[in-house]
């Protein structure tokens, strides 16, 4: 941020558009381009404008951390502002921020209107959180019939590899 990157870019929606457009042009057509943003830098007054710049630039999915840079990681997360963004863009929006429990996930989905979540610090403190959310909110087994984690989200995303498989490769 001291060098104008990261969340500082949220002060310059046109720069966000330029960057995502360049990534979209450089990436193979079959490879999805996604972006992650906070609600803003000092405040959330440009949140929708930034989200539209990212979507118009070619992002096919947008993750929104429901706080500004100035908010840092202090509660609360403003999930209802994620809903404002979701309604303003024509790409899938994923809610992120302050999801520590299944109940938090439920409240986040309701307030944001999103169909999916990105977990951050909550999954570090509870590594089983994603599986608990999948089971409790969506009634899904953590694995499909072939024992693989089902892929959700953007089409053409790389396959999900179970952690146990990754450990055998180390």
Report the location of each language-model feature:
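Active-site-proximal loop/short-helix segments
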Residues: 1-4, 65, 127, 132
């Amino acid at each position: 941020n001291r060098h104008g990157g990261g969340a500082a870019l949220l002060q310059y929606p046109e720069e966000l558009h330029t960057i995502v457009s360049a990534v979209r042009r450089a990436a193979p057509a079959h490879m999805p381009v996604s972006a992650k943003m906070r609600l803003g830098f000092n405040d959330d007054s440009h949140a929708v404008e930034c989200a539209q710049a990212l979507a118009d630039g070619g992002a096919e999915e947008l993750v929104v951390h429901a706080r500004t840079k100035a908010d840092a990681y202090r509660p609360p997360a403003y999930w209802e502002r994620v809903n404002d963004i979701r309604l303003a863009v024509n790409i899938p929006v994923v809610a992120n921020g302050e999801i520590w429990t299944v109940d938090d996930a439920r409240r986040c989905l309701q307030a944001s209107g999103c169909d999916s979540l990105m977990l951050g610090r909550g999954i570090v403190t509870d590594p089983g959180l994603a599986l608990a959310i999948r089971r409790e909110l969506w009634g899904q087994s953590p694995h499909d019939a072939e024992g693989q984690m089902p892929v959700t989200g953007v089409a053409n995303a790389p396959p999900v590899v179970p952690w146990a498989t990754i450990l055998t490769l180390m």
